[in-house]
Regions:
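Structured, active/binding-site neighborhoods that engage oxygen-rich ligands
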Residues: 1-273
């Protein structure tokens, strides 16, 4: 999860068109670098999935709703969208046909706990459907999770690109240099996930992946969170960046991250963790 969280933190000062910085030479961290709803919801998904391993879909979805509402209410001012912000406080929360990129930004834990691609896609669907039950919202989560799963199980970038294009129909032919000049703040999966995957595909290492994603502009924290989640699985995350990540979280959130790390380490889950 470090990849998603670091992408969120690094991208946070540059979110929205008025703050976009369309180059790579920016300070990776500043006093404005902070976690947002992307981090909170990723950790909520992780906690829910860890607590329901081996249980049925209904139990998993119930846990997702419970943990997302619990953590979301604990951190209320972290940039939630209008619909989602209302959903957090509903007594009987229902999905609302969203195709926003929130489904993709929070999905990474599903790709680490899954044992194969079929399970990856199934868990990704479940994490999306509790809010983002529009086909594009589900597709964005599944495409992101699939890329993470392929990356963490040793597949190369060409394989990842080909699978995403074939399975999900995303056009990954444009380069970042072609995307950057006209790209602007947009929050749909279909206009965020392909760009985030492209940023990963063009990157040289983990840090460069984050810088490339942020340099595209747009919804920079979410874009970088998605890119970072794939880049972590492919490159790993340098220890100094892990330390920086941990110190920018609250004790409550850092505890969830430690629990997550412990499970991946103890179970020797495949990947560059």
């Amino acid at each position: 999860m470090y990849g998603a969280i670091l992408g969120d933190i690094v991208g946070s000062p540059y979110e929205f068109d008025c703050n976009n910085y369309k180059a790579k030479d920016f300070p990776l961290f500043s006093r404005h670098s902070d976690f947002t709803d992307d981090t909170v919801m990723t950790l909520a998904v992780a906690k829910a999935l860890l607590s329901t391993r081996g249980q049925d879909d209904a139990a998993i979805k119930a846990a997702l709703v419970r943990e997302m509402q619990r953590l979301g209410r604990a951190y209320p001012d972290r940039g939630y969208g209008t619909h989602f912000g209302g959903w957090l406080y509903e007594d009987d929360p229902q999905p609302y046909q969203s195709y926003g990129n929130g489904s993709a930004m929070r999905v990474s834990p599903a790709a680490w706990l899954a044992k194969n691609m079929a399970e990856t896609l199934h868990l990704a669907r479940l994490t999306a459907e509790v809010t983002h039950d529009h086909p594009e919202g589900i597709k964005g989560a599944q495409a992101t999770a699939a890329a993470i799963f392929l990356a963490r199980t040793g597949h190369g970038k060409e394989k990842i690109k080909a699978y995403v294009e074939r399975k999900f129909g995303y056009d990954l032919s444009c380069t970042c240099d072609e995307i950057r000049p006209t790209y602007h703040h947009v929050e749909s999966c279909q206009e965020t996930v392909p760009q985030a995957i492209t940023a990963f595909l063009e990157s040289r290492d983990f840090e460069d992946a984050l810088r490339t994603a942020v340099s595209l502009g747009g919804d920079s924290d979410t874009l970088a969170a998605i890119t970072g989640s794939i880049a972590e699985a492919f490159y790993g995350v340098p220890e100094e960046l892990r330390q920086e990540c941990r110190k920018r979280l609250t004790p409550k959130l850092a505890k969830i991250l430690r629990e997550w790390e412990s499970v991946l380490y103890n179970e020797k889950i495949c990947g560059r963790i």
